[in-house]
Amino acid sequence: MAGNSIGQLFKVSTFGESHGVALGGVVDGTPAGLEITEADLQIDLDRRKPGQSRYTTQRREDDQIKILSGVFEGKTTGTSIGLLIENTDQRSKDYGKIKDVFRPGHGDYTYWHKYGLRDYRGGGRSSARETAIRVAAGSIAKKYLKQFHGIEIKACLSQLGPIKADVFDWNEVENNLFFFPDVSKLEALDEYMRGLKKQGDSVGAKVKVVASNVPVGLGEPVFDRLDAELAHSLMSINAVKGVEIGDGFDVIEQKGSEHRDELTPNGFTSNHAGGVLAGISTGQDIIASIALKPTSSITIPGNSINTENEAVEMITKGRHDPCVGIRAVPIAEAMMAITLMDHLLRQRGQNPHVHHEHGPIPGSV
């Protein structure tokens, strides 16, 4: 099965299914000498893991990471880093009745037609459970980027259903179970989600991810432009149906005089482009947003077909997230980190000699 790896010089490959024995991955390209422990990776995994609130799936997985290789005496060796997370709370019996039925809005129908068979237990390979290894790999990239280059990556839930953040207080993001930056909306979020659970329905969300202190020059025009690669990596996250860089689709209503990010000796005057021009980082904050669809795993009856092309009524059972966007926050950070790490190594490999007398201007005035 192709499509299990991302990156060139910093390459992440994953394997495993939702109800399989374990999830695993291999991370290639990490420079030697980075101090890393399982506890370092566990921090982000704990932010992502299921069962932490009544608004995420109640599947209980500890997501305990094991480093199998590539680390010796607490430091990376420069060789492949092997990662493993055992699955401990599978309830495959929840899915026995749908082994011949296609859940609408899921990959059951497409996987079956592509491969001639499918793992119906929790979605198999198409389950968002696969992203646990991405988060672990992203933690390696995040630590390297911050320690050696001062690059910091953060994300938040900026919208859940109709409720939007009007204030972005990043200090509050880790203080609530929604990863929401506007504390004035927390009560409304709680009330909305309680109503949603009573209805047996789900809702979509928007996640914002920001990378700060990114150097000028990352990105490989024309097909590996940094924004194109970010869109690729973020779009690969389960349930993502849209990616915006900078102002995104708001640029439709902007005029050129408004949108252009003017330059001064003291820095850029704005950042409508989201930190990328012509596919190359500008040194400003890189800003991206992703739109996640509402999960189709809901208890409201719906229409579908089975493998015999017969009409059936579908009611999804099992343990599911009423809003997948909540746990997507650390996943978005991980994919941003993996992409920036790869392009940082690529720039260092191709253009280490490029230096300008005056250096880059600040990211903002």
Swiss-Prot record:
Which NCBIfam families does UniProt cross-reference here?
aroC, PRK05382.1
UniProt keyword annotation of Ribosomal protein present: no
Q: Which family does it belong to?
A: Belongs to the chorismate synthase family.
Biological role stated in the UniProt entry: This reaction introduces a second double bond into the aromatic ring system.
Which UniProt keywords are listed?
Amino-acid biosynthesis, Aromatic amino acid biosynthesis, FAD, Flavoprotein, FMN, Lyase, NADP
Q: State the EC number(s).
A: 4.2.3.5
Q: Which GO terms describe its biological process?
A: amino acid biosynthetic process; aromatic amino acid family biosynthetic process; chorismate biosynthetic process
**Broad class of enzyme this protein falls into:** lyase
Which organism's genome codes for this protein? Answer: Pseudoalteromonas translucida (strain TAC 125)
Task: Name the reaction it catalyses.
Answer: 5-O-(1-carboxyvinyl)-3-phosphoshikimate = chorismate + phosphate
What does the record's cofactor remark say about binding?
Reduced FMN (FMNH(2)).
Could you say which residues bind FMN here?
Answer: R125, S126, S127, N238, A239, A278, K293, P294, T295, S296, S297, R319
Q: How does it assemble?
A: Homotetramer.
GO cellular component assignments: cytosol
Q: Quote the pathway field.
A: Metabolic intermediate biosynthesis; chorismate biosynthesis; chorismate from D-erythrose 4-phosphate and phosphoenolpyruvate: step 7/7
Query: Can you say what this protein is called?
Result: Chorismate synthase
Q: Which cofactor does it need?
A: FMNH2
Name the InterPro entries on file.
Answer: Chorismate_synth, Chorismate_synth_AroC_sf, Chorismate_synthase_CS
Q: Where does NADP(+) bind?
A: R48, R54
- For the keyword Flavoprotein, the answer is yes
Q: Name one GO molecular function term.
A: chorismate synthase activity
